[in-house]
Amino acid sequence: MLIQDYLDICDPVLTFDRFMGGIELEKYLKNIPQHYTGRLRYDPVSMLKTVLFGFMENGYISLRELEDQCKVNLCFMYLMDHQTPSYRTFGYFINEVLADSIEEIFQDINKKIFETEHVDLQHLYIDGSKFEANANKYSWVWKKSTEKSRYRVFDKITTLFAEINEELTCTGIKLCINSEYAPEYLKEAAEQYAEAWQIDETAFVHGRGHRKTTQQRHYEKLREYAAKLEEYVEKIKICGEDRNSYSKTDHSATFMRIKTDYMGNDQLLPAYNVQVGVADEYIAVVDVNQYRSDMDCFVPLMNKFYTTYGFYPKYPVADAGYGSYNNYIFCEQHGIEKYMKFTMFKKETTDMKYHKDPFRAVNFPIGEDGIMRCPNGKNFYLQYRKNVKGNKYGRQEEVYQCEDCSGCPYAEQCKKTDKNRTVRINRELTAMHQEVIENLESIQGALLRMNRSIQAEGTFGIMKNDRWYKRIVRRGIKSVLLEVFLVSIGHNLYKYHNKQKKVATAA
């Protein structure tokens, strides 16, 4: 009897095999190197199917588990036609063959699912979750700490240069004293110093009972500081402009505060920020970021969606972690409706006392003369405009100050200091917040919010609790992205099979 004769008609492997039969898999396998000696290679199409089915069936499957399943599991035997590749073979296939084509495979599988299931891509439910990286917990490197250490070394170099210049007065050589120094300059200074005193490193003394000469001490200090500066430059370069930390055992991982605090000390852990956009329970777009905040991940995710599908979703629905001025402006520029909550959304919509508080600056009336007035009728005049840090679109806050708060009967309710009250206002952002409230408080908005909590958060719930994928296994941003794509493909195929099974059962 054939293996398929032992399988149930609704077995996931049969659904998977029928589905993959409609996709041209050979085009992803063109880069496999040709070997003309040794044993015959395994069929790459069967290998690809086996890997994808493993992630569909298990959520995440290790290389050792793939090897074992091919020996004992009928489903894997059916796909591999009784062949049993080793875990090394699977590892080579995933890392060398699939690494460059995995995103295209994800897109083509999604395209077929979405056409079959008539998935609505105009409504995209967005959420992010931090997955702990495969890195040591106490392997952090902090960018600010590194910069402080570097400036302390700069001060030591300045002191050392002053001593050396005094020593080299008779030779006519003078080292330039600056506020900052490059490692290359220190190496040149060490060479000049060695040449001036004709230093022979083989004559250096070390250890107890030996006294170093002034020239040896200065020369060794120059070499030591140059090495230190090179180390600091490398650390700052690895961090980049957008990160404040990284792990020594996985340079791509950033230290973040994650919800699962199993250490019980509120400790930052190395992690990746995984973002998904879900449409009709399927992962339509997925991205891996090194940002700690979801706010910075919205635009890259939308651009990735556009690159994949050729348009932006009309209704991206997200929680309060995504509502920022930058993201709202991006939505306006690309014809996207604003359905992302902002930080104070819940308080604005549920606490009417706070929302209508007459002492909030946004509720101060503005007269026909354009002057803002407080409940006591005092005028507020513009003092200056201030650029908001980290803003991409030139956002400015207007700072107003009351003309005179002395003797005000509402002083205790209105202000906390003895000075005239100062308020900061961004009318454009306030108008955006009001638009978001109107969108999300409508009947359509309420349905979209409910669906987001079910679909987007539910996707991570299925990944972590039902399919036991709670931690990143690979290291390096490229390898992590490969892993997340495999998990996402497995999730979508798992969902597709369940829906097909429901239809077959109902029929």
What are these regions (language model features)?
Residues 9-49, 55, 427:
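Basic, short loop/linker segments at the boundary and entry of helix-turn-helix/winged-helix-like folds
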